[in-house]
Swiss-Prot record:
Protein name, entry field: Cellulose synthase A catalytic subunit 7 [UDP-forming]
Gene: CESA7
Biological classification of the source: Eukaryota, Viridiplantae, Streptophyta, Embryophyta, Tracheophyta
Segments on the Cytoplasmic side according to the record's topology features: 1-213, 259-845, 893-907, 981-991, 1043-1063
Region (Disordered), start-end ranges: 116-154
Function (record text): Catalytic subunit of cellulose synthase terminal complexes ('rosettes'), required for beta-1,4-glucan microfibril crystallization, a major mechanism of the cell wall formation. Involved in the secondary cell wall formation.
Organism of this sequence: Oryza sativa subsp. japonica (Rice)
Catalyses which reaction(s): [(1->4)-beta-D-glucosyl](n) + UDP-alpha-D-glucose = [(1->4)-beta-D-glucosyl](n+1) + UDP + H(+)
Subcellular location: Cell membrane
Gene Ontology biological process terms from the UniProt entry: cell wall organization; cellulose biosynthetic process; plant-type primary cell wall biogenesis; plant-type secondary cell wall biogenesis
Amino acid sequence: MDTASVTGGEHKGKEKTCRVCGEEVAAREDGKPFVACAECGFPVCKPCYEYERSEGTQCCPQCNTRYKRHKGCPRVEGDEDDGGDMDDFEEEFQIKSPTKQKPPHEPVNFDVYSENGEQPAQKWRPGGPALSSFTGSVAGKDLEQEREMEGGMEWKDRIDKWKTKQEKRGKLNRDDSDDDDDKNDDEYMLLAEARQPLWRKVPIPSSKINPYRIVIVLRLVVLCFFLKFRITTPAMDAVPLWLASVICELWFALSWILDQLPKWSPVTRETYLDRLALRYERDGEPCRLAPIDFFVSTVDPLKEPPIITANTVLSILAVDYPVDRVSCYVSDDGASMLLFDTLSETAEFARRWVPFCKKFTIEPRAPEFYFSQKIDYLKDKVQPTFVKERRAMKREYEEFKVRINALVAKAQKKPEEGWVMQDGTPWPGNNTRDHPGMIQVYLGSQGALDVEGSELPRLVYVSREKRPGYNHHKKAGAMNSLVRVSAVLTNAPFILNLDCDHYVNNSKAVREAMCFLMDKQLGKKLCYVQFPQRFDGIDRHDRYANRNTVFFDINMKGLDGIQGPVYVGTGTVFNRQALYGYDPPRPEKRPKMTCDCWPSWCCCCCCFGGGKRGKSHKNKKGGGGGEGGGLDEPRRGLLGFYKKRSKKDKLGGGAASLAGGKKGYRKHQRGFELEEIEEGLEGYDELERSSLMSQKSFEKRFGQSPVFIASTLVEDGGLPQGAAADPAALIKEAIHVISCGYEEKTEWGKEIGWIYGSVTEDILTGFKMHCRGWKSVYCTPARAAFKGSAPINLSDRLHQVLRWALGSVEIFMSRHCPLWYAYGGRLKWLERFAYTNTIVYPFTSIPLLAYCTIPAVCLLTGKFIIPTLNNLASIWFIALFLSIIATGVLELRWSGVSIEDWWRNEQFWVIGGVSAHLFAVFQGLLKVLGGVDTNFTVTSKAAADETDAFGELYLFKWTTLLVPPTTLIIINMVGIVAGVSDAVNNGYGSWGPLFGKLFFSFWVILHLYPFLKGLMGRQNRTPTIVVLWSILLASIFSLVWVRIDPFIPKPKGPVLKPCGVSC
């Protein structure tokens, strides 16, 4: 078909409408109409044409012909060489004329693009070209793709820095760099560096990983022969003991396989922050880094000290990231006036703390932990005013800390009439179980500047509404409320979730995450980036394995080589679209032959088939289930309606208030109503009409908030056009979306946001995302990204483990159990094994408790689980023991974990297994099957104690979790004494079985040694109550066993009957 004929025939009219998005097809720069497809002339606008080429099938929706590249448009893979590369290169990168026009922009308080009113920050599009900018409406229909790079700047410092790094890497000769003074050559070098990947995968060296895999296979073979030997050689004089031990060993083998297979191909990753800066943060241009919203959650400020929460917030506000792209939301689920006043003081102190951190680039940027460091703080500091300003800042922080302590002391005793705010009005949250929603914006509005006149990141206090009779779903419900509030106020495309006791230890942590999330290829497939948890304030020997190094440095790296690490509840950067239940984009295979390769008589068949292909392609990001499918289909039309609607009307509503009334937002007149949408259908074509009617399905899924629904359709982040015109109306809309009844009859907690149904909502939420096909990434920068506090006290540590295990049991008993959920989906098999291991590990406590009891029983009764310890049995036992040691040693070799950390992990696996995990199994069964709810308590976070750094370590707190391990220790000690005494007094036929029994008993006690040491505390004595309970249980067990004596056959003699003879 002739292109000219198409152009003249199809575009005689002055205006043509794009058949994809419904917008007008704009003319080209030379005034001629834009024709996307030269074969059929199907009307498609330039933005849709470029998006289809970069993200879609690259084919025309009507004739299925592959789109050819138009001059000035970015290249994609598969484009033919048209001989105009050099001209396009100069035109795309604009080396000669870097200037361009910027559209006017009016500053708005809650605008995520710009707050200075000078020029809007460029928006970033996930998965878009690496060096491109986008402007225009939020719908993406009017977006005009800009040039991939703008040249003409000197950037001398960056060039020198780049040359130095390249010389160190051996990629650049020093002589060449000295001679290369030409400006254009420097620019081309920067272009080449900026186009390099932002990250790379670093596999484990084969010299370390291959022996590890070989030993795993050998251990599996040895394990099979060992189990065969154990099953085929029963102990006839102790069948119950033998049967119990074999069942335990079979379970341990299955548990080991589930734990070992996901660690088959571990990987590590490294990032390139300099390339990120060259690509998205170039000097003299608006920053194009993606905005991010921080979420901090807290429940009880008396258990979670406000000074710790304040330090977390301060470290967020001082993060090394553009201030207009950072927002911090603090969720107060306890509606505490103490936290409200604390954040007010924190916002005031941040005006001095944030510029101090950025001026001297200090780390960490949490003042409590920065000033408590026992290091040379003058190292690498060259500013002469640093010492003086640091001394002044430390004094100001101490004064700030005293004010916070005064607030805490005041909050200890609540007045009878309730708390009263400074203006004399009663505090709305006096009743923590019945109060309205509250929102307060401290920073981020105009006028909230630091002492140097620079802007500060946004800081927002949020306390969701609570009413009797509603299930608030604890932390998961609070996080979902923050998702909705942030979407209404800022709507950043990424969300970083932190616990209140986890501060930002690496100010560049967000940039580390953006190296993955803003990557051209990987970013659009990622649901979250997970950072490892690191802790402060742990004793040097880590008695109770609080650091959990084995999990974070071994298991998580193994998962990163499959589909990604699990979500661990904090230190995670989420893709907002993944939280909304959308599927990741599905890569479609390009057809080997297109229409222009077939004869003309086949074109109609191809077009018919292409129609189906185009239809299926529209649902590229369908929801996770239920009504989630097809959410992308009405996106363009619905956004077009909001855009046209915003030109006529603005958001209504009165002035913003701190707290909504008892009916909250229900009386508030919203700007977009469903009735108005239905009335506005007249005059639209069929495509737009069907798109607008899908508003009802959106409300069933996301809730009845048109502003929030519109924000979910903006993939790039940012507020819908016109929504930011009235900040007061946005506050009222935000109060509406945190009302207690908002989630009724919606998909929140089921398919959207944090998933309900378990106290470990983190595991469930990550599992749902991976089932949809999303991937996650494990980021381990050299400097820990975040650090938190861990419960170093034995009782608190066991209660923490109890809560985790209880959540796993709840997931096991739910429909989301990995054993039977989402088969046929996009969850990889090894990833399913890993999730299965995370929910079945509490059940290991039952065979573990039995196996730790068997050695003592054998010593008390003189029986053994093995009939005869012959040479073959000895070989299998020794081979299994050596394979376990070899696996552990090689695992430490490739992971870098110390042997002490590995041994502490093994010890606490036994301690937690026979205590917290055991209780979690029974509590979980009672909760799920019997309906008996077990309320979990928040683990207390102790503030820093300068008098005794580890005073909490020796503090004893009574809990029933201490009884089973103590009983095991006493039983095994009694068994050792009884076994040795019996051998000495009565002799022993064979010392081999005796040594085997003694070895197993000592092995149990050795694993429980940290627990025993914790019971003794500082005074080296076990609490009386624990001793009494344990001795009582051990005595009852021993007496019953001796009385029954099940392994000694009853003597059967002749039956005596009266014979009638006197004898």
